[in-house]
Amino acid sequence: MRVLQVGLGNIGGGLEAFVMNYYRELSKMDVQFDFVCMYGKIAYEKEIKTLGGRIFYVPNVKKNYLGYVKRFKQILKKGNYDVVHVNMLSAANIVPLRLASKAGVRKVIAHSHNSSCPGMVRKFMHWCNRARIKKICHRFFFACSEVAGRWLFGNEDYDAGKVVIVHNAISMERYLFSEDHRAIVRSAFGWGNRFVVGHVGRFDPQKNHEGLLDIFKEILKKRPDAVLALVGSRGGQYENILERVKSENLEDKVFFLGKRTDIGAFLSAMDVFLFPSLYEGLPFALVEAQANGLTCVISDTISREVNVIPGQLKPLSLGTSPEKWAETVVRAGKRPRVGKEEIYQGLVEGHFDICREARRLKKLYGE
C-alpha cells in the first residue's frame, strides 16, 4: 500500500512527529509513505529516505498557485496512490484535497490537527472551506481529538460519528525517565539540584510564551533556585521572548535549548512541565511529558483526551493569576514521577501506544 502524505513542513513539530511515529511502524507492515512539501525543506528528510519514502517538493501554493497545481497533478498521475492523507492545521488550503479527489484517488483523507488558527484571513478561509471539505472527502474525516474534529468538520458530522479519532501515539521507550540522562543534561547546563520547570513548543503565539514568562517570574518568588528550560524551534515570537528575557535580567535563569531530537533526555532533567497554550489540537508534547512521568500544569483550553494517567495533568484557566499558576507549578514539582507500568497501562488504554495504533491506522487505510 502506498500513501501520499501532505502537509508536513520543515519545523519538525507535532504534526511532523505524528506522521513519523506512524511511518516508523507502518513501514514494517508493507505500508509506504511518500511526501509532498512546499516549504523547500522537509523535517526528517534523511530518515524518510532511509525508510524508503520519496519526497516531492512543489511550489508554495500561495506564491505560485498554477505551479503548485501542475506539479501536484504530475505526482498523483505517476504515483498511483491508494490513499492521499492531507494533514491540516486549518481548512485555509483545501487544494490538495480537491486535486486528489479529481484524480480519482480511492481514499482522500482530511485530518484535523488543530482547534483554532491565527489571523483573520486564515480564519475566514477556514470557515468558508469547511463545507467544501465534506463534499470532497465524503466520509474520510480524521482528527487528533474531539475538539479538533468539531473545529474542522462541525458538530453535526462529529455527533453523527463521521469523524475518526486517530490518536497522537508515541513509542514509550523513547521518552521514559532516565536517571542517567537527568544527570548528564543537568551537568551539561549547570543546573545541579535546581528546580527545573520545562516547556516544549515552537515559539508561536499559540504556545503563549509571554504568559509562560509571567508565571515563571512568580515561580522565582517561591523558588529562587528555579530555572526555565525552553525546548522548541524558533517561530515568530522567538526574538520577542529573547529580548524580554534580556530586559528583565532573566538570562541566567531562562535557557533557550532550541529544537532537540533527544526530547526524552531533557524531559528527564525536568521537575515539572508547564504548558499554558492558548489552544491546541492534541499536543504531542503533553503525551511525551506524561510518558516521562512528569506532572503537567496546563491551560484548561486543552482537550482532556490528552490525559494519559489520572491526576498527572493540572489544568488551570488562562484567566487565573500567574501567582496561582506558580503555586500549582511548585506543588506539582514536589510530586513523585509516575512509574513505568502505570505509564504503559495509561498509554494503551488511552490509545497512545504506537504499535497498537499503527495497526489500527493500516486497517483504516484499507477500508
Regions found by a protein language model. Give the residues of each.
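A conserved mid-protein helix/loop that constitutes part of the nucleotide-sugar donor-binding site
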Residues: 13-21, 195, 199-218, 239-240
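N-terminal strand-loop element at the rim of the active site
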Residues: 5-70, 234-238, 364
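Aromatic "clamp/platform" in nucleotide-sugar-dependent glycosyltransferases that forms part
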Residues: 89, 259, 278
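A short helix/loop element that forms part of the nucleotide-sugar donor recognition site in Leloir-type
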Residues: 176-190, 243
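Short hydrophobic beta-strand element within catalytic cores of glycosyltransferases
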Residues: 35-37, 286, 295-300, 305
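Active-site donor-binding acidic/aromatic loop of nucleotide-activated sugar
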Residues: 237-240, 251-260, 266
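A short, active-site helix/loop in glycosyltransferases that binds the activated sugar's phosphate group
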Residues: 136-176
